Amino acid sequence: MSADVHTGRLRFTKMHGAGNDFVVLDLRNGTPPPDASLAARLADRHFGVGCDQILTIETPRSAEAVAAYRIWNSDGSHSQQCGNGARCVAAWLVREGTAQGDVFTIDSPFTAHRVERLDAGTYSVAMGVPQFEPTQIPLAGFAHARDEYALPVHGETVRFGAVSMGNPHAVVEVGRVDAAPVERVGALLQQNAAFPESVNVGFAQVVDPAHVRLRVYERGVGETLACGSGACAAAVVLMHRGRVERDVRVSLPGGELRIRWAGEQAQVVMSGPAVFVFDGEWNQ
């Protein structure tokens, strides 16, 4: 698929990973990327195509990569990391013939990702090494990493773990994820001065040591059916606390992901689906 975002016609591919949905644009022909206004209109579910994020395919930035991609949230802002998006980009590149073989590398705004095709619709992505130091998240007001932080938020104390997966995450452990105050607490933490770059907020329920249920309130989007980097963040925070095993199944409203982390300086590996929905053309 190719795109010309300034002539009125925009060809795209609609995809999703566990319900986290994307509009994929190929900008490798030199077409300039969409500005924030156009990205927000394209992502609008009533007046545009509708998606959580827009993924733009671009020429690689590193020698080992077959292509690069950037991420636009539905409000027009940028994101540094998107695990479900990485799998969808990988599947798109395989279908278009850009990626040869079952193992290859793609560049995200955050880092270069090693990708492996496990079968026709399932991919694993090396998501990078999690960063727990507050300065790297970033999380203001704390000098050293902790398993649990506490912040006073509108008269209540919110307790959470925090980690960067290339983007900031707070993880709130709850007894029942279905009853979690996702929108209320998610929005409050995103607006809190302790998170100078805002934050993705996950609400995680440990079902058993090999299974976690999760809902995520994302920056620039709101609650989504799935968040790949959020699943990684929840898993590693819970692994760090000894609450779950090093290989865990994460159930989100839109589907399931598998997260593996050997510990400390190892990369987190996420596996899950990448689904083509349709190809289309949008008349702006």
Curated annotation (Swiss-Prot):
InterPro entries: DAP_epimerase_AS, DAP_epimerase_DapF. Homodimer. One of its GO terms (cellular component) is cytosol. This is Diaminopimelate epimerase. The record marks 169, 218 as: Could be important to modulate the pK values of the two catalytic cysteine residues. It catalyses: (2S,6S)-2,6-diaminopimelate = meso-2,6-diaminopimelate. Signal peptide: none annotated. Catalyzes the stereoinversion of LL-2,6-diaminopimelate (L,L-DAP) to meso-diaminopimelate (meso-DAP), a precursor of L-lysine and an essential component of the bacterial peptidoglycan. Transmembrane segments: none annotated. Its EC number is 5.1.1.7. The record marks 278 as: Important for dimerization. GO terms for molecular function: diaminopimelate epimerase activity. It comes from the Bacteria. PROSITE patterns: DAP_EPIMERASE. Substrate binds at residues 20, 53, 73, 83-84, 167, 200, 218-219, 228-229. Its main location: cytoplasm.
